[in-house]
A protein has these predicted regions:
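Active-site proximal beta-strand in glycosyltransferases
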Residues: 4, 8, 167-191
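Short acidic alpha-helix that forms the nucleotide-activated donor recognition element
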Residues: 211-215, 314, 329-335
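Donor nucleotide-sugar binding/catalytic pocket of nucleotide-sugar-dependent glycosyltransferases
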Residues: 174, 200-206, 211, 215-254
Length: 335
């Protein structure tokens, strides 16, 4: 049986996002056909504990978890009084949190939210698209695990694209490109209120980095046929570039009963940190809600999904009809 290692930049549990659900479905399917191992990057100890849930569900899968946050920092400096130093660190973190809250509160106005903010630039991934150095402990860990006899190593998400430089050359390496970063950067830049010279520089440097990093993988998987064709043009070749089949199964013959609307409720579903979802909610509050009020139309604007907490007060001030309901657990979807 072939041995495959998946490397992803998070712990995909609980299943409270589309990405987590898709990865869960994929591993749940392929573990019956291959010997599966998964290497997670956990930002905190609490996040690492979620792996225990997956271990209970998949007893036939091997898990490797790198934890960025540790109880004791291995490279902590030598200090005269460790207890006093620890207290000062906590005080510093507390002060920084209070400073951040002050910054948010001073910009907490409806005018800022609906008119003055450049949401596209604020949420843009362009500044994070150029190579950022990894934790050396993580690179050592990935290298060690990757050289333990796998037939296939699959890396997912742009955050980890540079790992191709440290993977063994005698295995089949795959990069799953969930979103072509240079395309997203180009699309976002076109929506900036103004494009700066530094934006153009970052775009070109990131585009070159993405091209070179992809050369380190023997196979590349895009999520759509459109992205596959774009990648082929971008890389100058079509071989070993594939479009991924759908993983989630749907009942094609199931009939859905039409239920007429009985509530005057508009529902928007989407994670606020994913562009352009927040921008869309702001657009609804700015362009659509005033028109509905003018027509004396009573309604509720329900927003399902996380990522709107930072602007909750502003959104409710601008649109009292809004309901930020967060996540809604549906048994048929959640595990």
């Amino acid at each position: 049986m072939k041995k495959i290692l998946f490397i992803i930049p998070c712990v995909p549990y609980p299943l409270n996002s589309g990405g987590n659900q898709a990865f869960f479905q994929m591993v749940d399917y392929i573990r019956h056909k291959m010997s599966v191992s998964v290497l997670f990057y956990a930002w905190t100890i609490d996040e690492a504990k979620r792996v225990e849930k997956l271990e209970d569900l998949w007893e036939d899968v091997d898990f490797y978890t790198f934890v960025k946050e540790t109880k004791e920092e291995p490279d902590s400096p030598l200090v005269r009084n460790p207890f006093y130093y620890k207290w000062l660190k906590k005080l510093k973190m507390s002060i920084e949190r209070k400073m951040r809250r002050q910054l948010l509160s001073t910009s907490n106005s409806t005018v800022d939210l609906l008119k003055d903010k450049d949401f596209v630039r604020e949420k843009s991934v362009l500044p994070n698209s150029v190579y950022k150095e990894f934790d050396t402990r993580y690179i050592d860990y990935v290298t060690k695990v990757a050289h333990t006899g796998f037939d296939i190593i699959q890396v997912e998400f742009y955050e980890l694209i540079a790992l191709g430089y440290v993977l063994p050359q005698n295995v089949q390496t795959i990069f799953v490109h969930h979103e072509l970063r240079y395309i997203r950067n180009e699309n976002e830049m076109n929506l900036f209120q103004a494009i700066r010279p530094s934006d153009r520089m970052n775009f070109l440097v990131a585009k070159d980095f993405e091209w070179n990093a992809l050369q380190k993988y023997k196979h590349i998987i895009a999520l759509t046929e459109v992205d596959r064709l774009l990648l082929a043009s971008y890389l100058g070749r079509e071989d070993h570039i594939y479009a991924s089949p759908a993983v989630v199964k749907f009942e094609s013959n199931s009939e859905t009963e039409f239920i007429p609307c009985v509530h005057r409720r508009f529902t928007f579903v989407g994670y606020g940190e994913h562009f352009p979802n927040l921008d869309a909610v702001v657009w609804l509050c700015k362009e659509i809600v005033p028109y509905l009020r003018k027509c004396n139309f009573e309604f509720t604007l329900q927003v399902v999904g996380m990522g709107y907490e930072r602007y909750s007060a502003e959104l409710r001030t601008a649109c009292p009809e809004i309901e930020l309901v967060g996540l809604m657990a549906i048994k048929s979807v959640m595990v």
